[in-house]
Regions:
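Active-site-adjacent structural elements in enzyme catalytic cores
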Residues: 1-263
Length: 263
């Protein structure tokens, strides 16, 4: 559920633990979703029968204005077909949902680029179910130790937990790009690289996420880059893992779930 203020949260939840409130005060509006026990105002249909509701205050003026105009929290699932690459612009949404929705509100490109971090705060433990725009390190700085649950094959507690997700239609392989490229026709390769172009592959068949090696910039460009490469006439998209720290962990999570093969 998306809402516009922390004060609104108590209207549709049973309790709001102090640690969760601390995180909300630090990171809202922003890329953090908190799972909280729902009250009777939230129908089971909205939460797929779960006893918790996912709550977030988004950090965009247009969305906040929309939410302030409503007298109820807004359920807002991802605007893309299940399992495909997440959209980060209104054009992405239009391309895949044209004719299926009445309106698309265009607020520009997504500034974070990847989905929110999903966390559940209970009295005895704090659990991250999806890595996202707020890093594990940032959360630990605020509330101490947390545990991670990254996969669920059935009845996931949060979105983005299935082992296969965010996937292009073109085969998508993780590994050492230079080595992998030897196995394919150079004219039929797409490359999603962290910070440098690859030799022997046409530049128009490559996306560099951040030439400066900035993880936040890489996150901004991730899904748009994957979508661009998926439109090309290539047989395979080759990619590499990023540094396993900060937002790099969330980016790598998306790459691994999207991958056809990991080498």
């Amino acid at each position: 559920k998306h809402t516009h203020s922390i004060a609104e949260v108590s209207k549709f939840t049973q309790n709001f633990p102090s640690k969760a409130q601390k995180l909300a005060e630090k990171f809202w509006p922003g890329s953090l979703t908190i799972l909280l026990p729902k009250n009777q105002l939230i129908p089971d249909l909205v939460t797929s029968g779960l006893k918790t509701v996912a709550v977030r205050i988004p950090n965009h003026p247009l969305t906040l204005e929309l939410l302030k105009s409503l007298d109820f929290p807004l359920a807002a699932p991802s605007a893309n077909p299940f399992g495909y690459i997440s959209p980060t612009t209104a054009l992405h949404v239009e391309a895949q949902l044209e004719g299926k929705v009445s309106y698309i509100i265009d607020g520009g490109y997504c500034r974070v680029g990847i989905e929110s971090t999903i966390i559940e705060v209970q009295e005895e433990k704090t659990t991250i179910y999806r890595l996202g725009g707020i890093s594990v390190e940032e959360i630990r700085t605020e509330i101490g130790e947390i545990e991670e649950v990254r996969h669920s094959s059935s009845n996931p507690k949060a979105s983005g937990m299935l082992k296969s997700h965010y996937a292009p239609t073109t085969p998508f392989i993780i590994g050492d790009i230079a080595s992998l490229s030897k196995d394919y026709d150079a004219q039929k390769i797409g490359v999603l690289a962290f910070n440098a172009l690859q030799e022997n592959v046409a530049e128009e068949h490559q996306v560099v996420l951040s030439k400066s090696g900035d993880l936040a910039e890489a996150a901004q460009h991730l899904f748009a880059g994957m979508r661009y490469l998926d439109t090309l006439d290539v047989e395979v998209i080759l990619t590499e893992l990023l540094p396993e720290e900060g937002l790099g962990r969330a980016i790598n999570d998306r790459l691994r779930r999207a991958a056809t093969t990991k080498k």
